[in-house]
Amino acid sequence: MLTLEVCCYSLACAEIAQAAGADRIELCASQQDGGITPSYGTLVGCRERVSVPVHPIIRPRSGDFCYSDSEFALMKCDLALVRDLGFPGAVIGLLDEEGHIDLRRMGELMALAGPMAVTFHRAFDMCANPLQALSQLTDLGIARILTSGQQQTAEAGLPLLRQLQQASRGPLIMAGAGVRLSNLHKFSGIGLQEVHTSAGHCVPSTMRYRKAGVSMSHAENDEFSHYCVDGGMVEAMKSALQMMETVGCSI
């Protein structure tokens, strides 16, 4: 059966995802930035209260994946912390100025990660040569690659996802970006073993008083709602995957 990884942006989201049947959690902060390294408190809370595997992302900022020396130093500190807290895996990714895998720095992080299972995240979708990158990540010992097939959505990227799945001699290819209940069968149909979803929705604030005209970020953002995992959607996706496994074919 396809493994269902759910992207979570808080401890509360992780607990919802776990209760709904997620097989694994990618733990991030800041959904509006595409996911950055979660706080120490969130990491500790997840270690204490979440029993399914949790893989925190190690990403010091939003934007591209070509990092300065100081940013890379932060990544090493954060990865060592995640390792020492006992997480079974971590999610990382670095590119150089030409859009190739930053082999030297990735090698340093892999050595630092030790026994943790390392996912190379969607920096892969920004690399210049995906098949070369797959070979390099295989040599580095990466456990899985999270990718949309270098398209805006994984469904649009199905041709490259199929090619990567057929070519991989090591890393699992995990589809992510726009993975939904309605298209799960398409990823199973090309032989993938894992999918990644946010399965999220906006939850309204409990505040009754709402100050108008002031924003803590972008003016167009709603300060009185936050993004959270939709437990019902995770349950529905998990049920669909179980049904696909039971009947032994795509639905």
Curated annotation (Swiss-Prot):
Coiled-coil positions: none
Superkingdom of the organism of origin: Bacteria
UniProt keyword list: Cytoplasm
GO MF, any single term: copper ion binding
Family: Belongs to the CutC family.
NCBIfam families referenced in this protein's UniProt entry, alphabetically: PRK11572.1
Protein name: PF03932 family protein CutC
